């Protein structure tokens, strides 16, 4: 436990494997270290190394952590489950506080204004959410690219998420007492759920 001026502060480990594989350590609201592996297919091989590298670079051991936050998707099943499982296991083993972040919210948090966020859902589809002044008003959903229309006055943000984004969003959300207790995976697809053919995004 990190103590500053006699007051307890968080040592938070953020983990995300929704696109690449990454881990980051925050002391309070300060980013201390990060480790990123961009390989979109090497999640299982890289997750342990990412966590280890981030902890070593921060000069701490896992036992000193107070919180773990995991990106919970939406993302394809194979990669997403790796980071989530690692985070849940670590938090349960060490009895740490565990938080979950929807990754489109994390991406939107790093932007300003009215935005539409999309990420690659594979199978020729997109994960989608719409935000007005930082508040999510639509999504998350799976959509077809041809169904994506960006309303006037909105910016389209299309990129993957990482552990730093997840951590920054979680810290800001927890400071406002936002409930991040949902740590269930968001796949938005299963064998018996068909994605929508298109999503007309209107203003």
List where the protein language model places each region.
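Short, conserved beta-strand segments within well-ordered enzyme catalytic domains
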Residues: 24, 36, 67-69
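Conserved active-site region of classical short-chain dehydrogenase/reductase
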Residues: 45-48, 84
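Oxyanion-binding and handling regions
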Residues: 2-31, 38, 42-46, 99-203
């Amino acid at each position: 436990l990190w103590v500053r001026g006699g007051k307890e502060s968080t040592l938070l480990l953020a983990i995300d494997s929704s696109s690449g594989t990454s881990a980051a350590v925050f002391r309070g609201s300060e980013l201390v270290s990060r480790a990123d592996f961009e390989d979109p297919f090497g999640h299982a091989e890289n997750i342990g190394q990412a966590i280890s590298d981030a902890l070593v670079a921060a000069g701490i051991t896992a036992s000193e952590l107070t919180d773990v936050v995991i990106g919970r998707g939406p993302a394809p099943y194979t990669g997403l489950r790796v980071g989530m499982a690692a985070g849940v296991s670590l938090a349960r083993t060490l009895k740490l506080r565990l938080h979950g972040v929807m990754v489109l919210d994390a991406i939107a948090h790093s932007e300003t204004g009215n935005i539409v966020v999309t990420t690659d859902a594979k199978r020729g589809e997109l994960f989608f959410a719409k935000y007005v002044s930082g508040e999510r008003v639509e999504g998350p959903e799976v959509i077809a690219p041809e169904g994506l229309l960006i309303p006037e006055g909105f910016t389209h943000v299309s990129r993957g998420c990482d552990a730093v984004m997840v951590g920054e969003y979680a810290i800001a959300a927890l400071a406002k007492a936002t409930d991040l207790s949902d740590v269930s995976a968001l796949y938005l697809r299963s064998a018996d759920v068909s994605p929508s053919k298109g999503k007309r995004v209107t203003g």
